[in-house]
Amino acid sequence: MTQSPRGLLLAQQTLSLTSWNIQASQSRPVDRSELILDHILKGPKFPDINFLQEVASTARQSLLSNPRVRSSFLTTDAEDDTSFKGVPFATMTLLSSKRFGSPLLAEEEEEGEGEGKGGSKMVLDSVFRMELPSRYERDALCVNIAAPAVPGAVLRLLNVHLDSLDSQFRRALQMHILAGLLRELGCSGGIIAGDFNAILPDDHMLVDKHELVDAWVALHGSTTGPDGGATWGVGVELRDGLKPGRLDKVVMLGLQPDEIDVLQPGLIDAYMPWSDHCGLRCTFTV
């Protein structure tokens, strides 16, 4: 969708984002993804934007057939499964239909054919995937939103799952590309969020290197100890000297972080976590 948006809002808006790596590799991916989705949607703050990583094909099908998703969200990868072929999992982004609308629907509402609330919604501009240099065929799922305060520009939402394990040099290249996407001509800024696989000290330097804002650091300061924002290995027994890590992040450019919290996974069958990752919930001002 590349039509020019209409009826842009000029006032500042607050949006909420939830990001969660739902772990495709463990058993029962559909059951676990449904529990995570239920937890997200039953939370005290209904999210405007949902970033999901490690979505297996079966979990994708379950999400797309979920009545709440169908009635309440605009969803990427709904029309075909191209991005899920030849890979064990991919990313998906869900946008609240209360806060976001397509250009066509926005035009209809402006003309009085809708419910007359088109002006309260931000308008979807385009969706694409940017291939990244990756050992695992990872990409960045990009959703462009018509920027409320900058006519003709877009607000860019990047859902990412960076390379794993010892691929730090690839993660550095990936972050260079992602930071560049937020600084492209016509982009007023945006969000990079998801599983950064930040397991080494050098990984945590990449946000500052590219002059981006790490929402957790900006709002909480501490990145160590029980309140340090760890999202992996939390509340479980770890072996081989491993410690909980802040693998998942929300970083931004040109936006104001307001709140960020870690969402703990529950258990399925009293012993299996919904995911080996916690989720992140962040609110920010555009």
Protein language model features and the residues they cover:
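Active-site beta-strand/loop signature of hydrolases that rely on acidic residues for catalysis
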Residues: 16-22, 36-64, 143, 156-160, ...
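Short, solvent-exposed loop/turn elements at domain surfaces
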Residues: 25-29, 223-226
